Structure formats: structure tokens, C-alpha cells
Design a protein with these regions (language model features):
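N-terminal Rossmann-like FAD-binding beta1-loop-alpha1 element of flavoenzymes
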Residues: 4-31
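Short His-Asn-centered micro-motif
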Residues: 9-11, 32-34, 62-63, 194, ...
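Glycine-rich FAD pyrophosphate-binding loop
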Residues: 23-48
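Mid-domain catalytic core of redox enzymes
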Residues: 25, 216-312
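Conserved beta-strand segments of alpha/beta enzyme cores
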Residues: 28, 51, 76, 208-210
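N-terminal glycine-rich dinucleotide-binding loop that anchors FAD/FMN and/or NAD(P) in oxidoreductases
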Residues: 45-70
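A short alpha-helix-loop-beta-strand transition element characteristic
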Residues: 67-89, 145-148
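Active-site/ligand-binding neighborhood in enzyme catalytic cores
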Residues: 86-93, 99-228, 232, 236-239
Length: 312
């Protein structure tokens, strides 16, 4: 007879929600994770009194009231609004693309002026059916927005020229003709006060948890540990890369503690020119409106993936 009803591989958000719901229904769960901590990619670590998002910025947002009420069982959320900034050759632009962006780029004031400029640029390009991502983006937003805010950033993310990327990667690029810097359109939005790790800790309180545990080694030694397995890792790895590895990318994070109370004045700044090696800088204290004397920043570098490093 198995010791557990469920072996859950991965202590991230999906695995932890499953474990919580299962234990609430009287099931016995063992949750394992190959990392040395729980919470997966939403893991936050307190550094200098600042909750640092160790795997990139995570802003919770939803329009579903039931989901919002559910996560608020495990943590209080603040009213943070995601309003990233793009830096291109020392000029700053608001994201997502909106009237603040267009006003800075072209010195205009009205939606009609912005629409006319974009439409004119698209017409001059005379692109038929887009053959690649570059043509797709140009046909959607015109030359200036593409060259300044999309091209370099996208090439850094994917590690190849936009002309070598398929058009289907970008289905649409939202253009807002209002002065609204809110990145999301959802009804509810915020950051867990005190970090996200506490949410996962509470969800896993009724389960057995083992970190630093590789599933493939563990299951060899414990083949009958559970009646059922919930696997939240890489599906290609689960099947032994039988058909080869999927086309992942990876991200390298370079964290730095700085002796200043405010480095960039915003939580997220994207660097969209190709010459800057990183894709963005996150200043974590701004997620919770921190007043600490020091600050922690993370530079993100996109990288080729290979087995043994984190896939994204």
C-alpha cells in the first residue's frame, strides 16, 4: 500500500495549490522540489529588508473575483500597479504603448495624431503577408515603435534576429490611445505584502515537503511512494527527451545591493536597444513601496538553454 495519495513534483504555484486542495479533502500529499526552496518561480527572498523576486518580477493580476478572494486567504495584497518603463539610447518611454509613449516619441498630444503617424508608417512599408516577426510587428505598429521599443529587446530575448523568428510569435501588439500606463487590464492587481513565499508555505502546511530532491532519482528508490503522481516539471524531460528537447530559453539574474535608497525610480525598466546586454533591471523595493536605506536590483540576461540550467 502506498504511503501517500499523491506525489506532487514541483512546489511552485500549481503543485502547491493542488496539494492544498487535496489535503483539504483528506488526501495525504508528498511534495518534492529539486530546488533548495519551495515556491518555484514566485519564490521571494528577504534581502536587506526587501522582498526580492528571485526569478523575475511577478505581479498578481486577475479579473476573476473568486481567484482574487482565494489568494487573499494566504496573504494581504497591496495596490501596486505594473507600469514598466522602456529605456532606449538614454530616452525613457512608458509601457505599454500608449499616448504617453507617443507624446514622448513624436511630440504630439492627441490620439488622432498618433493614429495618423502609425497608419502612415504602416502604409509606407507596403507589407503584404508577413514572412517573419519583423514584418509582422512593423505591420502592426509602424517603424518608430518597432525600431525603438521592440526590435532590440525581442532579439535579446530570443537570441536571434527578428527576421529569423516566425511571424506567429506576435499575434497582436496592443496600442492604447489613452494616457494610461497600467500594463494590465484586469480588475484586480497587486503584490503580496511580505512576499509570495509565505503563500506557498501556508498552502503546503498540511503536506510533507522535501526540497533538494530530484524526481527521477527519488522515484527509482521509492517507486511505490504514492498512488498517483502530479508532475509539474518539463514534459519532455519526463519522457526522457524521447523526441528531443523543446525550444526553451533561459534567464540569468545578476543581483546587486546598492547603497542608495532609490536606484531607478520604478520597479521595472526594460532596456530595448540591442547594445545593452541585459533585457531589464528590476528594483524590488518598489513592488512594496519600500523606504529602506539600501536597494536591491536584478539585471536579467537572456541565454540559450541547455540541459542542467533553468528553462523558461
Amino acid at each position: 500500500m502506498s504511503k501517500f495519495d499523491y506525489l506532487i513534483v514541483g512546489a511552485g504555484l500549481f503543485g502547491s495549490v493542488f496539494a492544498y486542495e487535496a489535503t483539504q479533502r483528506g488526501k495525504k500529499c508528498l511534495v518534492i522540489d529539486k530546488r533548495n526552496h519551495i515556491a518555484g518561480n514566485i519564490y521571494t527572498e528577504n534581502i536587506e529588508g526587501i522582498n526580492v523576486h528571485k526569478y523575475g518580477a511577478h505581479i498578481f493580476h486577475t479579473s476573476d473575483k473568486a481567484i482574487w478572494e482565494y489568494v487573499n486567504r494566504f496573504a494581504d495584497f497591496n495596490n501596486f500597479i505594473n507600469s514598466p518603463i522602456a529605456s532606449y539610447k538614454d530616452e525613457l518611454y512608458n509601457l505599454p504603448f500608449n499616448m504617453n509613449t507617443f507624446s514622448k516619441m513624436w511630440g504630439i498630444k492627441t490620439p488622432a495624431e498618433a493614429k495618423a503617424i502609425i497608419a502612415g508608417q504602416i502604409a509606407n512599408l507596403n507589407i503584404g503577408e508577413p514572412k517573419n516577426l519583423e514584418e509582422q510587428a512593423l505591420k502592426l505598429v509602424g517603424t518608430d515603435v518597432y525600431e525603438k521599443l521592440i526590435k532590440g529587446y525581442t532579439q535579446k530575448q530570443w537570441g536571434r534576429p527578428c527576421t529569423e523568428l516566425p511571424a506567429f510569435i506576435i499575434k497582436r501588439l496592443p496600442l492604447r490611445f489613452t494616457y494610461d500606463n497600467n500594463y494590465f487590464n484586469d480588475r484586480y492587481q497587486g503584490i503580496a505584502i511580505g512576499g509570495y513565499t509565505q503563500i506557498i508555505e501556508k498552502m503546503l502546511a498540511g503536506s510533507d515537503v522535501k526540497t533538494d530532491t530530484d524526481y527521477f532519482e527519488f522515484i527509482k528508490e521509492n517507486p511505490d511512494i504514492a498512488e498517483k503522481t502530479v508532475f509539474t516539471g518539463q514534459i519532455d524531460e519526463f519522457f526522457g527527451y524521447r523526441y528531443g528537447a523543446l525550444g526553451y530559453r533561459s534567464v540569468r539574474f545578476e543581483n546587486e545591493i546598492l547603497d542608495t535608497d532609490n536606484y531607478q525610480g520604478n520597479a521595472v525598466v526594460n532596456y530595448t536597444d540591442r547594445e545593452v546586454p541585459y533585457t531589464r533591471i528590476i528594483e524590488h523595493k518598489h513592488f512594496e513601496f519600500g523606504k529602506q536605506e539600501k536597494t536591491v536590483i536584478s539585471r536579467e540576461y537572456s541565454a540559450e538553454w541547455q540541459p542542467g540550467i533553468e528553462p523558461y
